Amino acid sequence: MKAKEIRDLTTSEIEEQIKSSKEELFNLRFQLATGQLEETARIRTVRKTIARLKTVAREREIEQSKANQ
């Protein structure tokens, strides 16, 4: 998911995406540990997606705090 696509989401949708991505990452790591994971690059992709989601969420927090001051 691109940062531009993430910015189009609402804050609650971003939080939901973070939650589902973390669950997916957990499952991928479990598959890796048991030797069932074939596409190991997927772990990296999911981690980067989580980082993008958290970055946009933090940007919104900062904007909101500046608006309140």
Swiss-Prot record:
Keyword Ribosomal protein assigned: yes
Family of the protein in this entry: Belongs to the universal ribosomal protein uL29 family.
Gene Ontology terms describing biological process: translation
One protein family per Pfam: Ribosomal_L29
Keywords: Ribonucleoprotein, Ribosomal protein
Gene: rpmC
Coiled coil, from the record: none
Name of protein: Large ribosomal subunit protein uL29
GO molecular function: structural constituent of ribosome
The keyword Ribosomal protein is assigned to this record: yes
Source organism, top-level taxon: Bacteria
A single GO cellular-component term on record: cytosolic large ribosomal subunit
